Regions:
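Short beta-strand segments
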Residues: 79-80, 105-109, 162-166, 240-241, ...
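Flexible, low-complexity linker and terminal segments
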Residues: 2-10, 20, 137-352, 357-358
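A short alpha/beta connector and helix-capping loop motif
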Residues: 435-450
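Thiamine diphosphate
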Residues: 1-140, 168, 232, 258, ...
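Conserved small/polar residues in nucleotide/adenosyl-binding loops
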Residues: 460-463
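DG-centered beta-turn motif at the end of beta-strands
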Residues: 418-431
Length: 463
């Protein structure tokens, strides 16, 4: 009898990676991806095998460290939240040009509805323009199985593979059947290193190879066990359901969907399966979490007169994460009976914790800033961002990791005085140091406060 475990989506992916012969995981923490690395760190197999686990300085360094392990023939995993892909983009996009040696899987955990993020960007776009195959599990079992398939795919085509999770997938639990444990790869090196040296002449050759391979990736997607066409008698509408959206569809049709369904969990989008559905159905409904990536692609594949519905046409909300109820409404089904929610506790808005050192920083900072009519305070990403809320109202901006120092510098260049930056220890080592170099180089008239709370809170501690 197969062993079964109750796992978060993050944990299922992490366990699948360990069982696939993982040698190293490199990550920068961020909701909803953090639990992947934490699970690997605490698993007995990690200690038994000596799997390398690292919280890197930022997502770019994590990507590069994993690429180095892949160069040496070992299987490596990179984990980050969706906005971390912006930081890792230079290394990620160019890793498609170098290719991989040992299996290399990059996990991006998206945050629709921005539960803990600045935006709800969709990481599938990175897979598209980097020409990297992308996997998107629809449930926890697939998260476990798929990461193992992703490592195999990476080594088959010598290419990094992107895996996309979403908040609900990452942070919900299900029973997962687990399989045997694969041995780690032995250390080995590429037969030739020309493609690893991205000089223009080498890159032009490699890019043509990558374009040829991308066509093969689509063929693989059309034949993948993770993409499935299920026929049904009512062909008035065909449904394309991507990733966790397929779970929501199944929840609304527990006895089977009466319409044809194309489940998509591996990209590039297989045009042949889309054309088959279009030829058999009167219209298409596209259900996907995040931005209308597949909906836009389908409109490019199919002739204009076909009725295509989804997030772009209002059948599904344009923003925010999907729910079984929003999918139910798009399917034209009557809503479930509901009951008024009980008011068990009074809502508690976010606030800096009692006793947190950041409170003292903001209390002192507010007193000083109140003495200067034009004082501006530029904050950064971390729990200290909560200084914007009552009772402090102490900051004016929070944009992205490291922006506090550079925005304060730019404001000072424009004549703002005093111009104050507030940044945490982790964010300073992530991307604040380069901005400080600019400020020092130009002798900028700014004040930089590095608020080191000596512990792991929203991000992680830096020594």
């Amino acid at each position: 009898m197969a062993q079964r475990e109750l796992l978060l989506g993050d944990e299922a992916l992490a366990l699948g990676a360990l069982h696939a012969g993982l040698s190293g995981v490199y990550a920068y923490p961020g909701t909803p991806s953090t639990e992947i690395t934490e699970f690997i760190q605490g698993h007995p197999l990690t200690a038994e095998r000596g799997v390398h686990c690292t919280w890197s300085a930022n997502e770019k360094t994590a990507m590069e460290e994993a690429l180095g392990m892949s160069f040496a023939g070992k299987r490596a995993l990179v984990c980050m939240k969706h906005v971390g892909m912006n930081v890792a983009a230079d290394a990620f996009v160019n890793s498609a040009m170098t290719g991989a040696n040992g299996g290399l899987v990059v996990v991006a955990a998206d945050d629709p509805s921005m539960h803990s993020s600045q935006n709800e960007q969709d990481s599938r776009f990175y897979g598209q323009f980097a020409l990297v195959p992308t996997f998107e599990p629809s449930n926890q079992q697939e998260a476990y199985d798929m990461v193992q398939a992703a490592f195999d795919f990476s080594e088959k085509y010598r290419i990094p593979v992107l895996m996309r999770l979403t908040t609900r997938m990452a942070h919900s639990r299900a029973v997962v059947e687990v399989a045997g444990v694969r041995a780690e790869n032995e250390c080995s090196y590429p037969a030739q290193t020309r493609q690893w040296v991205l000089m223009p002449g080498n890159s032009r050759v490699r890019y043509n190879t990558l374009l040829d391979d991308y066509a093969r990736f689509e063929t693989e997607a059309a034949e993948s066990r993770f993409n499935r066409y299920t026929d049904a008698p009512d062909k008035s509408v065909g449904i394309i359901a991507c990733g966790i959206a397929h779970n929501y569809l199944t929840e609304n049709y527990p006895d089977g969907c009466p319409h044809p369904v194309l489940k998509i969990s591996q990209y590039p989008l297989p045009a042949s399966l889309v054309r088959r559905m279009a030829s058999e159905c009167g219209s298409l409904l596209i259900i996907e979490e995040g931005q209308p990536v597949v909906e836009q692609a389908v409109r490019g594949i199919l002739p204009a007169p076909l009725d295509i519905r989804g997030r772009m046409t209002g059948q599904l909300p344009r923003t925010g994460e999907l729910t079984p109820d929003s999918v139910r409404a798009a399917l034209g089904l009557a809503p479930h009976a509901t009951h008024a929610a009980s008011q068990i506790v009074v809502p508690r808005p976010p606030a800096l914790c009692q006793g947190c050192g950041h409170r003292d920083v903001y209390t002192a900072l507010k007193e000083i800033a109140d003495e200067h009519e034009n004082a501006k305070v530029f904050s950064d990403i971390g729990c200290y961002t909560l200084g914007w809320l009552a009772p402090f109202h102490a900051i004016d901006t929070c944009v992205d990791m490291g922006a506090s120092i550079t925005m304060a510098k730019g404001a000072a260049d424009a004549g703002v005085y005093p111009s104050i930056a507030v940044i945490g220890d982790s964010t300073f080592t992530h991307s604040g140091m380069t901005g400080l170099l600019d400020a020092v180089n130009e002798r900028s008239n700014i004040t930089v406060i590095i608020s080191d709370n000596l512990t792991t809170c929203l991000l992680y501690t830096s020594d």
